[in-house]
């Protein structure tokens, strides 16, 4: 929900943080130019952030500090779905030898809470805290399929249907057709829709009242995951992991 009376000073501080996050270490002059702010104002924001450990200074450049990791770690640790799912995600990775993930929805985006690597897992661009469009991942589609249609429409309106690869879902009609299939099967598939050459299978994690709390998945190169795998032992293992998490949360 948009704030009725946003605080401009706070918005400018956050814009600086996000610019540093996207670009990496930057100096005052570069940041001022990129954000159309005065150099004095940029310097004041940065030194305040530095004072509290959120920004560090290396020479003439500033970079995001690890204080944000402390804040994010605290937020993640306080979430019951993370506490309960963590051992299952690790077990899923060990059993399959692949990459296992846990994702939740926040403000219409998917947020990776954790990942665990099996012996043969590929090293992807995902990390705890990474945000991604829900419609491009099996994890996200598992969540979307269990949200009210009106909520899905809100997410589309806010974030659109960005094409990450040629296989990404690009229309509302296509998305809702896919989500119907997810509900029928009980799990979602991503066949190169966020990263080409990668296949992913995910199952939702739901509360006793049916509220979707997140999703758990396994990701692997397409060369190691056949069509038969996507409809055989792999969904059984992922669904089993999701079921264990649900039982531990609900009972």
UniProtKB/Swiss-Prot annotation:
What keywords sit in the KW lines?
Activator, DNA-binding, Plasmid, Repressor, Transcription, Transcription regulation
The UniProt entry, under InterPro entries, shows: ArsR-like_HTH, GAF-like_dom_sf, HTH_MetabolicPath_Reg, Tscrpt_reg_IclR_C, Tscrpt_reg_IclR_N, WH-like_DNA-bd_sf, WH_DNA-bd_sf
Q: Using the record's annotation, list all stretches that form the HTH iclR-type domain.
A: 7-66
Any Gene Ontology biological process: negative regulation of DNA-templated transcription
**Keyword Cell cycle attributed:** no
* Gene Ontology molecular function: DNA binding; DNA-binding transcription factor activity
One Pfam family matching this protein:
IclR_C
Residue span, IclR-ED domain: 81-251
Give me the segments passing through the membrane: none
- Explain what the UniProt record notes about the effect of disrupting the gene for this protein: Deletion mutant loses its ability to grow on both D-xylose and L-arabinose.
Q: Specify whether DNA-binding is a keyword of the entry.
A: yes
Fetch the SMART domains from UniProt: HTH_ICLR
Look up the DNA-binding region in the UniProt entry and give its residue ranges: 28-47
Q: Which domain of life is it from?
A: Archaea
Question: How the protein assembles, per its UniProt entry?
Answer: Homodimer.
What is the protein's known function?
Essential for D-xylose and L-arabinose catabolism. Activates the expression of genes involved in D-xylose and L-arabinose degradation (xacABCDEF) and represses its own synthesis. Also up-regulates the expression of the genes encoding the ABC transporter complex XacGHIJK.
Q: What is this protein called?
A: HTH-type transcriptional regulator XacR
Organism expressing this protein natively: Haloferax volcanii (strain ATCC 29605 / DSM 3757 / JCM 8879 / NBRC 14742 / NCIMB 2012 / VKM B-1768 / DS2)
């Amino acid at each position: 929900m948009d704030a009725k009376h946003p605080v401009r000073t706070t918005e400018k501080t956050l814009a600086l943080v996000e610019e540093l996050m996207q670009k990496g270490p930057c100096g005052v002059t570069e940041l001022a130019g990129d954000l159309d702010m005065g150099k004095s104002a940029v310097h004041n924001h940065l030194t305040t952030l530095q004072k509290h450990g959120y920004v560090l200074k290396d020479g003439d450049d500033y970079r995001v500090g690890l204080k944000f990791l402390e804040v994010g770690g605290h937020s993640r640790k306080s979430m019951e779905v993370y506490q309960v799912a963590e051992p299952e995600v690790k077990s899923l990775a060990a059993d399959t030898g692949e990459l296992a993930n846990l994702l939740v929805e926040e403000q219409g985006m998917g947020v990776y809470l954790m990942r665990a690597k099996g012996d043969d897992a590929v090293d992807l661009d995902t990390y705890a805290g990474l945000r991604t469009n829900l419609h491009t991942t099996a994890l996200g589609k598992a969540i979307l399929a269990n949200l009210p249609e009106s909520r899905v429409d809100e997410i589309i309106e806010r974030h659109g249907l960005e094409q990450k690869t040629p296989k990404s879902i690009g229309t509302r009609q296509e998305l809702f057709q896919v989500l119907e299939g997810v509900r029928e099967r009980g799990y979602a598939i991503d066949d190169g829709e966020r990263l080409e050459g990668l296949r992913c299978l995910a199952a939702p994690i739901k509360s006793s009242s049916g509220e979707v709390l997140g999703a758990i998945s396994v990701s692997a190169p397409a060369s190691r995951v056949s069509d038969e795998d996507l409809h055989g032992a792999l969904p059984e293992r992922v669904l089993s992991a999701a079921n264990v998490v649900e039982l531990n949360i609900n009972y």
